[in-house]
Amino acid sequence: MTILLTAALLLSGCGQRLVMTRGFGKKELFRIGNTQCTLPEYNVFLLNLQKNCERTFGHDIWQKENGESLKEAIVQRALSEASRLKVMLLLAVQDNIMLTIQEENLADEAESVYYEGLSEAEKEYLDIDEDTLRKLFEQYALAQKVFKSVGANFEDRYDSFCTTLDYDLNESLWSTVKLADIEDLADTPGFSEVYSGYFGSSDLGKEVVVEEEKESTE
């Protein structure tokens, strides 16, 4: 698991310093700098990726020959996206970038649509309250504003900023990470699908995809 986390942080562009520590909150999965990500937040990313996979390959993909490797890939990808999001929030603070009232209202609407569209089984799996979920939509929108504000030099700025940060993993909680075992998972809208309906497509995961494609060709 430690190797997997290190790889995921590297894919997010932030893998310079990985520190194992104790003293985490009950649901705190990892820390980057002075921000954190909880397990419920991480599960939103993971569930979103799982939905996409099951829509393409079917619910039983995880029991097929390459199911385990695909599972490991999306667990890693979800961690990469969550890590990248949290770093971009720190950049937003540094650059004094904030959402407008209108953008906050859009995030509130998106959260309501997403939450109401979840099945009871999905809500139980995520174990996330609506306020945290609303903030996650806000954070996603804020990260996109950071990306657009920096422009063409974003990756250089991001990589440079990452070298100043420490990364702390709640290893015992990380060991509990698992996919949702929900048969009709693909029938409900995913987080990114709802987000794009209100804010347009996000660039948050694009660098992750590029890095993964590079590795697959090496």
Regions found by a protein language model. Name each.
Residues 1-7:
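Sec-dependent N-terminal signal peptides
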Residues 10-13:
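C-terminal motif of bacterial Sec signal peptides marking the signal peptidase cleavage site
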Residues 20-128:
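N-terminal targeting/tethering segments
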Residues 15-25, 32, 121-218:
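PPIase-associated folding chaperone regions across multiple families
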